[in-house]
Amino acid sequence: MPRFALLSVSDKTGLVDFARQLVDRFQFQIVSSGGTAKQLLEAGIPVTKVAEHTGSPEILGGRVKTLHPRIHGGILARRDREEDQADLAANNIQPFDLVVVNLYPFEATIARPEVTLADAIEQIDIGGPAMVRASAKNHAHLTILTNPSQYEPYLTALADGEGQIPLAFRQQCALAAFQHTAAYDAAIATYLAEQFEATSDRLQLSAQPVQVLRYGENPHQAATWYQTGATASGWAAAQQLQGKELSYNNLVDLEAARQIIAEFPADGPAAAAILKHNNPCGVATAEALSDAYQKAFDADSVSAFGGIVALNRAIDAATATAMTGTFLECIVAPSVEPAAAEILAAKKNLRVLTLADFNSGPQQTVRSIAGGFLVQDSDDQLETVDAWQVVTEQQPSEADWQELLFAWKVVKHVKSNAIAVTANGVTLGIGAGQMNRVGSVKIALEQAGDRAQGAILASDGFFPFDDSVRTAAAAGIRAIVQPGGSLRDADSIAAANELGLVMVFTGTRHFLH
């Protein structure tokens, strides 16, 4: 009995060689449509066009090709049901043994900057998903392939099984098929929700693996890196120029570093941030990038060992030389100058990456909890002082405003309870992750030491009591920036006035857990 294969693909990678082997090695008869049939015929492979197979022409400009009983009957027929076989015979329908379908490139289409809604709509596949789902449903009786990477394993299984495909193989292909259509529909729903400015009580998440990581946060935890969308973006689009394979912890720290450097546009002062365990240990700005890095390093040279460095400008030779003076895990910047690349290459295990757009972060963040997950808008608004309020008698100078803004940008990216002490565009002390705010204040001030005299202090949350203000003043802090919003704000304001401090309320809290 002849075997029939239905081929209709958008991704034509490996198509001709695969189809030729089906025909020459395994005596398949191929039914195909549109561009797939055209390519196979041009390659000299015998093909029956879908219109010939069904006896019905393509209509509506190709919108209706495969939606026909002779196609779907051949896919959905159960070989072990007499009534199904009788229906096939009565309607002269040939059952398919193999269906090879992948879908219109919707995600690649919407990734184009100039795409219109009409363009996107035309790339919503109808017949393809119908064939994929029907084939996956009936995997007990046929095989569905949705990715060119499956072609060689299928041919191997066919040869090893003397023409029979094992059920386990068909099951895996069916699962991949349903994942394929689910991801496709999720991409469409997400895009249309954005276009229609609509909200929904359902959330579709779709992702594909980029890399299986060596392990997660700890060696006993398995981990995989996924990207959203068919087109690589964010870290999936970054270029790793050298060094060891990225780890789970590297990626987590790199993302935190990206978020900090996104606060400092490349057309402003040079900026450098050094992170350890998802927290900044040194952040600095300067005219020269090498100076910004050195100041960030000197801010906490002990913690910088084994750290992650993010820079807002192309790495030059001077900065590269400075960074080779200590052990670092990763460096990321918009680009690397050739002379700098030669210098960094001496550190073979050092991971060096370029990321074209530091503002390419997600619009929402997702966190797993038992039985589900939480979704929130990303805290990625660029900070300005426009809506800030001076709440003390003492007023900030023009220079103070710049330093208050710098400190506020930094503390936003420190784990709560978060305190940052800064001066002249450099962090002097950072208190992170303490269970009480005054505890973080004390840690930051202890790190700053004598340098706290005349410095700025930023807090990611309000002060519940005036103890933090008094502790800061005793160390020499001259200005504080915080969200405000405590029931006891008046106590903190009174303490600041009593001690001659400037205090500014931003009106925005930046908890980070």
Curated annotation (Swiss-Prot):
Domain note: The IMP cyclohydrolase activity resides in the N-terminal region.
EC code: 2.1.2.3, 3.5.4.10
InterPro entries assigned to the protein according to its UniProt record, in alphabetical order: AICAR_Tfase_dup_dom_sf, Cytidine_deaminase-like, MGS-like_dom, MGS-like_dom_sf, PurH-like
CDD domains: IMPCH (cd01421)
Protein name: Bifunctional purine biosynthesis protein PurH
Keyword Hydrolase found: yes
SUPFAM superfamilies: Cytidine deaminase-like, Methylglyoxal synthase-like
Domain MGS-like: 1-146
Gene that specifies this protein: purH
PANTHER family in the record: BIFUNCTIONAL PURINE BIOSYNTHESIS PROTEIN ATIC, BIFUNCTIONAL PURINE BIOSYNTHESIS PROTEIN PURH
A GO biological-process term: 'de novo' IMP biosynthetic process
HAMAP family linked: PurH
Catalytic activity as recorded in UniProt: (6R)-10-formyltetrahydrofolate + 5-amino-1-(5-phospho-beta-D-ribosyl)imidazole-4-carboxamide = 5-formamido-1-(5-phospho-D-ribosyl)imidazole-4-carboxamide + (6S)-5,6,7,8-tetrahydrofolate; IMP + H2O = 5-formamido-1-(5-phospho-D-ribosyl)imidazole-4-carboxamide
MF terms (GO), sorted A to Z: IMP cyclohydrolase activity; phosphoribosylaminoimidazolecarboxamide formyltransferase activity
Any one GO cellular component localisation term in the record: cytosol
Annotated pathway: Purine metabolism; IMP biosynthesis via de novo pathway; 5-formamido-1-(5-phospho-D-ribosyl)imidazole-4-carboxamide from 5-amino-1-(5-phospho-D-ribosyl)imidazole-4-carboxamide (10-formyl THF route): step 1/1; Purine metabolism; IMP biosynthesis via de novo pathway; IMP from 5-formamido-1-(5-phospho-D-ribosyl)imidazole-4-carboxamide: step 1/1
Keyword set, alphabetical order: Hydrolase, Multifunctional enzyme, Purine biosynthesis, Transferase
Pfam family membership, one: MGS
